[in-house]
Amino acid sequence: MSFNNPDHQLDAIGLRCPEPVMMVRAAIRKMNDGETLLIIADDPSTTRDIPSFCTFMDHTLVAKDAEQAPYRYVVKKGL
């Protein structure tokens, strides 16, 4: 899976912790199992928070580009 053709997209540019993760959680609640969410963020804490959220909430971190901002993540709802 790459960053192309996600089912949903979330722009969290300019938001700071804890807002990005709260928005991810709200977006994923509305999704069906197996759908993907592309997250674009510039808060450095997301490099830690998004992977931790996936582990804790049993979602799959499909792709991650966190070398420099803007950071990009693709999360699949469910495992």
Swiss-Prot record:
The gene is tusA. Its main location: cytoplasm. It holds the Pfam family TusA. CDD domains: SirA. Belongs to the sulfur carrier protein TusA family. One of its GO terms (molecular function) is sulfur carrier activity. InterPro entries: Sulphur_carrier_TusA, TusA-like, TusA-like_sf. Sulfur carrier protein which probably makes part of a sulfur-relay system. SUPFAM superfamilies: SirA-like (SSF64307). GO terms for cellular component: cytoplasm. The active site is at C17 (cysteine persulfide intermediate). It is found in: Cytoplasm. This is Sulfur carrier protein TusA. Keywords: Cytoplasm. GO terms for biological process: tRNA wobble position uridine thiolation. PANTHER family: SULFUR CARRIER PROTEIN TUSA, SULFUR CARRIER PROTEIN YEDF-RELATED. The lineage of its organism: Bacteria, Pseudomonadati, Pseudomonadota, Gammaproteobacteria, Alteromonadales.
